[in-house]
Amino acid sequence: MLATLARVAALRRTCLFSGRGGGRGLWTGRPQSDMNNIKPLEGVKILDLTRVLAGPFATMNLGDLGAEVIKVERPGAGDDTRTWGPPFVGTESTYYLSVNRNKKSIAVNIKDPKGVKIIKELAAVCDVFVENYVPGKLSAMGLGYEDIDEIAPHIIYCSITGYGQTGPISQRAGYDAVASAVSGLMHITGPENGDPVRPGVAMTDLATGLYAYGAIMAGLIQKYKTGKGLFIDCNLLSSQVACLSHIAANYLIGQKEAKRWGTAHGSIVPYQAFKTKDGYIVVGAGNNQQFATVCKILDLPELIDNSKYKTNHLRVHNRKELIKILSERFEEELTSKWLYLFEGSGVPYGPINNMKNVFAEPQVLHNGLVMEMEHPTVGKISVPGPAVRYSKFKMSEARPPPLLGQHTTHILKEVLRYDDRAIGELLSAGVVDQHETH
């Protein structure tokens, strides 16, 4: 079987990188005349064994660029996030729906040797293999990098873990909040004199997903240059520590321990949220000119030439006194009044929006950040759309997140060329499962 799978993989690799087919382009079988109308990853197949957030976020972004994402799930259970609610829409959680568009779901029991065989056969005809199991878990099933590399040396194998492949805590399960704590993010998040706070969205997971997405794109370019695949080690801890940015540099270079600042900034004053008569506004003055403009808008011109506030260094040193003056002034007017006064000033500013206001924000709507699609069982749904737009292809059309096992039979037939009898036997044995839509 291994020899057969290797031959299939070699044939696919040759077709992908030779551009053979008379006027056909890289990655796709479309005529050259259509090349400006396709997404860059059309023709690329992603075998996705991830669940929860970091991995699915990475593969969703790849799917947005045209890749065919085959999502492998456990029969009868599926991705953990399918049950993470409320809220639910029909039987689907909105959490799951938020990060799984543009995918096909195949339900396979990978604890069964026949299920392992299916995964290996899929790997042989895919370009990318993504998983987020604890290190060694898939190797014990015969699906580790060495196992897949033997039959598909072209494969980009991306492993997403909590803490890395090796090391003293590499065998721990990794969840966003825990990695956020270990990495220091939670230590620097929260009110100045209060307890550490978990960020309102799972930024460690999302940052890891973006790192994995970028690494996979780099892997595809590397494969284009060399014809060979590679292994990618991506983890929550490394991703978040790398994102500590200047906070980490303050400690590593300046030996300055970090602290919590609430909405304020440790090195820039003023740069924080201010309470208004009816809400909050965030204002930032990153230089002396912007600070002078803030003072004029607040009708506090006497602060501009005050020797205690003439430079950012002095403003940081005299933070408490200055913020008290500014805060008292901001509380005298409605948020809408301040938004009107700051408009066109050149000073960065904005309201603190709840979700209702976010998705009523004209710029959010203009940027196309609400994506609508037709779900097979619940009808029209809306999810956050892609953050990036491209001039040569559109991101507006998307397939809805799949039902559990919705595409099992389709993938076995169309991708692996199984016949009806073989598929029926696998279904009867519980190796695979097919969701029937009505």
UniProtKB/Swiss-Prot annotation:
UniProt transit peptide range: 1-31
GO molecular function, one term: succinate-hydroxymethylglutarate CoA-transferase activity
Keyword Mitochondrion recorded: yes
GO terms under cellular component: mitochondrion
Family matches, as InterPro entries: CoA-transferase_III_domain, CoA-Trfase_fam_III, CoA-Trfase_III_dom3_sf, CoA-Trfase_III_dom_1_sf
Keyword rRNA processing: no
Alphabetical keyword list: Acetylation, Disease variant, Glutaricaciduria, Mitochondrion, Transferase, Transit peptide
Swiss-Prot/TrEMBL catalytic activity: glutarate + succinyl-CoA = glutaryl-CoA + succinate; 3-hydroxy-3-methylglutarate + succinyl-CoA = (3S)-3-hydroxy-3-methylglutaryl-CoA + succinate; 3-hydroxy-3-methylglutarate + glutaryl-CoA = (3S)-3-hydroxy-3-methylglutaryl-CoA + glutarate; hexanedioate + glutaryl-CoA = hexanedioyl-CoA + glutarate
SUPFAM superfamilies documented for this protein: CoA-transferase family III (CaiB/BaiF)
Source organism superkingdom: Eukaryota
Leader sequence segment: none
Residues at the catalytic site: D205 (nucleophile)
Known function: Coenzyme A (CoA) transferase that reversibly catalyzes the transfer of a CoA moiety from a dicarboxyl-CoA to a dicarboxylate in a metabolite recycling process. Displays preference for succinyl-CoA and glutarate-CoA as dicarboxyl-CoA donors and glutarate, succinate, adipate/hexanedioate, itaconate and 3-hydroxy-3-methylglutarate as dicarboxylate acceptors. Acts on intermediates or end products of lysine and tryptophan degradation pathway, in particular catalyzes succinyl-CoA-dependent reesterification of free glutarate into glutaryl-CoA to prevent renal excretion of glutarate.
Similarity remark: Belongs to the CoA-transferase III family.
Name of the featured protein: Succinyl-CoA:glutarate CoA-transferase
Protein's organism: Homo sapiens
Gene that encodes it: SUGCT
